[in-house]
Amino acid sequence: MINHLFPTTTVGSMPRPQYIKDMIEYQTINNQTTQFQNTIDRIVPFIIEMQDQAGIDIISDGEWRRKSYIGVIADICSGFELTIRNVNGENQTWHTVTSKMIPKNPGLFAREASTIKKYSKSAIKVALPSPYLIAERMWDKNLSSHIYPTRKDFTENLIPILRQELIKLRDEGVSIAQFDDPHLCLFVDPKIRSKYKNPELEIQYSIDVLNRIVEGIDGIKLALHLCRRNKGRSGWIAEGGYLPIIPFLNNLKFDMIMFEFTIPVAGDESVFLELDERFDIGLGCVDCRGEHIDTPEEIVSRVEKALQYVTPERITLHPDCGFAPGSAADIPIDEAFRKISNEVKASMILRSKYQR
């Protein structure tokens, strides 16, 4: 149990050394799952220990087993194929749902957590992709509609699968289940909202499906992570403050909402005044995209901007996003270590000033 102010965490993914990237790519193509899992089991303790050495309070396994934070659903269920799709003018390889989803590897997230428990006594957080996000990225009208006629049909079928994964995480003793939904956060941008016939209905639906997953499940803290997409050194996708989505977030039956505030397009922290006080706030106060290593003092300054509107008891520190949402991300691991180490130092400075 964490009983001090300004606890620290990561968002989930940590940079992977090149040999792990190569292993993931080989496993994806050749489907040698058992060999891959046996090997990665011997490697993951390194990233667990790295977070412990930095002093992070709530740790993950770095998502080193995953090709991506979204595509992990294809590791849990059959029904997906690797396809080449045009995304924003670029041909990219995506998992696309092409047949009925059948759980083939249930409890995958809980098994990730069980490995962490073997090597650390720290609190554990595991990230899951939201059903709305999965459907946005992995349903294709031409390839998927014969089995799931609409994107919404696909989304609805994801809900019971993710609900069972959440229950298994709770039963494994995980402290926090974090649902990732950067697509929901894109609706902060008026240019993106303009592409939808009824963006308000889209936002509300993304909240509704999350609430249906977690309904009646207690014994685990629930967090929602929001960001404007993480393109690494290339930056982000959407721009704008959170105010357009705050009324919808207030309907969320979660305990914590995680916001990014390091990037210059995130708006003003005064938006927290519009957020229901029942929510704890995850404050993105460490850059995960650029080369600059935030100093502890820079991180403290960002947190103190939020403290103008939020009590210290509600704030958890974290980077804006994961350092490597996809396995191909090229952020150096030593850079990430220095950043999260400074995050911990900032937390200690803040506690010395605000802990009573």
What are these regions (language model features)?
Residues M1-R356:
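Domain-level signal for soluble alpha/beta catalytic cores
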